[in-house]
Amino acid sequence: MNRFNLSLLITSLLLQFLGYSVNGQEYPCEKTMVESLQHTAWVLNKPESKALWNVSLNAPIIIIDHFNNKMFFTSIEDGRVQAIKEEPWDNKVPLANSFFDYEGKRYVTIIHAALMNSPCQQRINLLSHEIFHTYQKSLGIENQYSVNYYMDEVQGRALLQIELKALQAALSGDSMRLHDALYIRTYRQSLYPNNNEDLYELNEGLAEYTGVKLSTENMQEYVKNRLNYDISRGYTNAFGYFTGSAYATILDQIYAEWRYDKDLAKGLIYLIKKAEPQYAVTINKSTLDKLLIKYDYAQIVANEKEELKSFGDIEKFKDLLKPETSKLCIANQKINFTYNPNDRVISLGDAVLLRNMSIMGEWGQIKAKNGIVRMNNWSAFYLLPPTNITNNAIQGDSYEIQINQGWKVVEEHGIYSIVKE
């Protein structure tokens, strides 16, 4: 699976839908799966929904009930839900809120538990978000995976926190706070020139904006609440959902036609500055210093440094990047994987440390619960060396691997791999 396809699985898991309320709804939704699909189909078929992007948001859908090993096939077409067909899941489709090509056809994929454990309006949000992803290319918006790993480093997180605080006030019409948010953002991006914040924000932020816009009555309040900073959350993948929907909501206030602008693909910040040129930023040290004091940057940094200690011994995973260090290597060949994009990601230079991940390949399945290294070029994944190996299983420090028949573990000079027998 190439890097492009992998990114579709990673950035669209949207596990953060679990636990969020819409308009104060925290009670369970009593609608059945079919009723929720019908409700969503009705919403998407409304004239104002079609007018949002000048497209009809129809899509084939697979809903994956992994607890009962079932897949439900259906589609939303012009306000109607097509007859549902069921077949065994058997890991044939990645467990993700995303989209996936299956047997020659592209489907939106939805985790049954993520759908059914959400409030009623949030179900519309989830479905609309993922359906938007299948249409975004027609709007000039490319699928992107986040390379903004500094969002989980101390300085990057501290500056993001200031941007989120300023954005919350900006949503209420405070133009000075919008300037603050854009100033800090510009400064952060100058520190990390290889970022793709603006493009990733388009990818996930506009999908989030679409889902919220079609499901929530008080959109401004919802988006504000999503900007509340959580020091334990990972932001490398999550930030774009929050900042993107916030800047899109601000554009609704200052530039009503922004969704149809020919320069949409250049980013939301570009459109804000195009509509309101006074928000263009030139970094000045004196102004920057005053802004950092205003938002108590020093204390934010101190808090971030303390929180980083909770991740454990990062150095033992960084050592896996050394050629001579014993490790289990998983090559990126014909694999699918999922992980929680809410979780924190630690940059290791040429790789990142993820807290947990599931990987599926023709050789079997990995469940890593507390640390797995992924190379930045996506070529391989590294785990700490195994502590126990049997014919069909590998156990290590907080990970388990089930090995399929016809495969085995081999070791050479301390480097473990899974190969065909």
Q: Where would I find each of the regions flagged by the language model?
A:
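Bacterial N-terminal signal peptides
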Residues: 9-17
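N-terminal mature-domain "stem" immediately C-terminal to a signal peptide or N-terminal signal-anchor/transmembrane
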Residues: 25-83, 207
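Catalytic zinc-binding patch centered on the HExxH motif and its immediate surroundings
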Residues: 84-105, 117
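Short pre-active-site segment immediately N-terminal to the catalytic Zn-binding motif
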Residues: 112-127
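Active-site recognition of the HExxH zinc-binding catalytic motif
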Residues: 125-137
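Post-HExxH zinc-binding segment in Zn-dependent metallohydrolases
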Residues: 138-193, 197-223
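Active-site-proximal alpha-helical
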Residues: 191-221, 226-286, 290
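Non-catalytic terminal regions of proteins
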Residues: 263-421
